[in-house]
Amino acid sequence: MPITSGADADEATDFETPMIKTDELRTARIDSLITPAELAERYPMTPAVADHVLDARRRIEKILNGDDPRLLVIIGPCSIHDPEAAVDYARRLARLREKYDSRLEIVMRTYFEKPRTVVGWKGLISDPDLNGSYRVNHGIEQARRLLLEVNALGVPTATEFLDMVVGQYISDLISWGAIGARTTESQIHREMASALSCPVGFKNGTDGNTRIAVDAIRAARTSHMFLSPDKHGRMTIYQTSGNPYGHIIMRGGKTPNYHAAAINEACEALREFNLPERLVVDFSHGNCQKQHRRQLDVCDDICEQIRAGSTALAGVMVESFIVEGTQKITSGTPLTYGQSITDPCLGWDDSETLLDRLAQAVESRL
């Protein structure tokens, strides 16, 4: 068919077929999203909180480097669904931070995004009303306000970075970050980790594979180019300098991997690439085989390893809340205050016991 040109082309335009839509066939616009800059202006970080975040990051980096013999403890609810209960928990944790300051670096787990194997509630930011209404602007405001309040109490915060955009809204308030078991192998999450200003832990795969976490650490230590909105919502090409504080989180898989043999095996994999032989053990998930009270058993084993002189154990993770266990979201039924709506957690009394055991074990390092 000959190409139409000149006057013929002008005439042809009058009879052009209307454009057929081939994109956005499965999406519907919900709302405009506030920009990170607008949110930070609405809920600004104070100089005192900024100093607190930077100081906490430096302390965590020293622990990961082996320059501080204390133990990093990431502890808190599986996920945040009730900011009021989260602040209540943070106040309790602040007292224990002060009590165990010479032995433990206690950081509160403040997870706002939940990865799902198939479907389920995806976290406070996505669905703050717990009803599928997806008021993301409200959720992201609640998350930032909570982080400001918890940090103002003197408690550093930790979170999992899942969505590639959410970090722009809250990462300035985070002292330690995690990349989850389902995303550790993802290239874009490794690139994001290389850009983050806080230390980042990579979980082993859901099947227990630690090699993907080692590869993620190596990738995150190098420079990357990636595309992302900036604080004002403009699409931007970024170059990262790399994150030297990546580390493995041993979270178990089909079987637990907190035992000394598994820790030694992970250290050998790190040694192969001249990476620091320091790691964090998750007491929950595959290591407790979804039985939340077994976190206390995992704790006892880790305490014995610390007393036996293990230098690999830089930190631990614990799922803990005010009330033990978990609950389901049921329409018309009020939720139990201070109890998880995702993974079951240890209650407050058991959490105090666990922290005391860890503090006593760390005495042998000092």
Locate the predicted segments by residue:
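N- or domain-start disorder-to-order transition segments that initiate the globular core
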Residues: L25-L64
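Active-site-facing alpha/beta catalytic cores
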Residues: P18-E24, A90, R103-Y258, A262-I263, ...
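Internal helix-turn-beta structural module
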Residues: F321-S364
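Gly-rich Lys/Arg/Thr-decorated short loops/hinges at beta-loop-alpha junctions or inter-strand turns
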Residues: P36-P44, T240-G252, L335, Q339
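Conserved phosphate/anionic-ligand binding catalytic regions in large, soluble enzymes, centered on
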Residues: L72-A85, D343
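Conserved, mostly hydrophobic/aromatic
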Residues: G76, V281, G347
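Polybasic, low-complexity association/targeting segments
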Residues: T13-D31
